[in-house]
Each structure stands twice: as C-alpha cells, then as structure tokens.
C-alpha cells in the first residue's frame, strides 16, 4: 500500500524562496505539496497561482491573515479529509529555512 505524507507550507507574503523550495521539492519527487496563502493579498496572487498551476501544488487560501497556527490547522483538516492513505504530515516554512535534505 502506498502511503501519503503531504508537505504543508503556510505562507504570508512570500519572497523568491517559496518558488525555489517548491521546485526543489518537485525535483526530489516529494509531494503532495499543500500551500496555505495566509491572507497575503492581491499583489502575491501571481506567485501562488504559478505554484498551483505550473507546479501542481494544492493551494488553500485565507482571505485575511489568521496566523501560522490557524493556517496549519486549515491544512491539517484539508489533508485528513482528502488523503485517504495519509500517515502524517511534514511542515516547512516558506522562507527556505527548511531544506529539501531536511524534509526528505
């Protein structure tokens, strides 16, 4: 049986480190990747849309900033309800603090 371990990345107003991290995770064949836009605003929509459309990330959005804890809870609930064979989750920060080597 194949198990699922989603990688959850909450993000508020991401910089270039988030797309870089996602590309590295995809190259390492680590997925699914669930990103929570925690109320970043319209000026960041393009970054999130690209990650969803071009890199296959699952994008969850909060209309306003609710904080990292609420963003994680939102993603955990999504994963519990959508990944049948999930055995756990990995969380990573969008600023590149956690490397692919650390995550893997």
Regions of interest found by a model, annotated:
Residues 1-104:
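Structured catalytic core of nucleotide-sugar glycosyltransferases
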């Amino acid at each position: 049986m194949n198990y699922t371990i989603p990688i959850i990345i909450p993000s508020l107003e991401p910089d270039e480190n988030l797309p870089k991290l996602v590309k590295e995770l995809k190259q390492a064949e680590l997925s699914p990747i669930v990103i929570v836009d925690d109320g970043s605003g319209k000026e960041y929509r393009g970054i999130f849309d690209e990650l969803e459309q071009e890199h296959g990330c699952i994008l969850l959005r909060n209309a306003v900033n609710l904080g990292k804890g609420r963003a994680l809870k939102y993603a955990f609930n999504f994963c519990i309800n959508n990944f049948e064979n999930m055995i756990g989750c990995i969380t990573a920060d969008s600023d590149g603090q956690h490397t692919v080597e650390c995550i893997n």
